[in-house]
Amino acid sequence: KHHSLQVVADPLYFQELPSDTRPAVAGVMQPGDFDVTAYAALNDADAYTRAGIADEAWNAEQAQTLYAVAKSTVTPTATYAWQGSGTWSLDALTKARAQGYTAVIADSTFDGEQTDTVHTGTYVVNTSAGDITVLKEQSELGTLAHGEATSARATAEASDAGRLARMLAQSAFYQMEQPYATRNLLMTFSRNSSASWINQVMSAMEQASWLNLTDLNTMAAADPYSVSSEVNQDDSNAADVSQTRATLEQLSSSRKDILRLATSILKKGLDEDDVSSLNPQALARQDASSTASHTNDP
């Protein structure tokens, strides 16, 4: 319905959707919503290996392969690494680039610098694995799109109608402060945004004469606001590595139990390929199938 709405799909979940319900996508993200920011913050690749999570399971090539199989196409689509539970540190960006991603989606914590006027949210970061483009969400518009008020004092933003009115007013203000400047601003919806809310926002944005709705490719190709080999991140949203480590240890223990069971009790009924398939990634694919079958997800 809204051609300007850009959908970035998790290819694992995308392939489980019935073909007649799959949305048109602007690109795919890392499979299984793998948390690259937590991976870099934990800085323990062996912990992931012990848990049965290989780098090859979530790189850009695998994302493209899963999408191509689901769509029965040889035409590649764009790949984006989506921000996880923490911030995009230089280490996280380097890992994403090494995994084949040339662009990442970041929330407003990516750049801690405060500027007087709004600017294009495109950054280029030089990493040891190569340059990577960061598409940063604009803070106020993103907060409102996520269904949140911009401050505790903004009582008028307690309802969807109030937040939508503020969103339009805010975007008009940005246009008036620099009427002849072209700036590319990113706004995303949260994972629990309802279809009704998304429809309201997109309908209003499409009717706003002062806005020109473009796409992620256009933003990625825009002149970057900053080109640097450093990241000026806001650490207030740092990844909780303790939870990640606990989860990995649990996965590792479960994987050992499963493999032990497969090799000792079920040895006659399984070959080596069957045993190697008993890992968290296989479980993730089953989870994707289960999740995709639920109808209450917007």
What are these regions (language model features)?
Residues 63-73, 86-105, 109-110, 130-298:
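Catalytic grooves of carbohydrate-active enzymes
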Residues 18-22, 92-95:
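Short acidic, glycine/serine/threonine-rich loops at helix termini
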Residues 1-21:
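Active-site beta->alpha N-cap acidic-glycine motif
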Residues 105, 121-128:
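General marker for long, soluble alpha-helical cores
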Residues 24-53, 101-112:
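Acidic, His- and aromatic-enriched active-site or binding-groove loops in soluble protein domains
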Residues 112-120:
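Short, charged, surface-exposed secondary-structure boundary motifs
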Residues 48-78:
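Intrinsically disordered, low-complexity acidic Ser/Thr-rich regulatory segments
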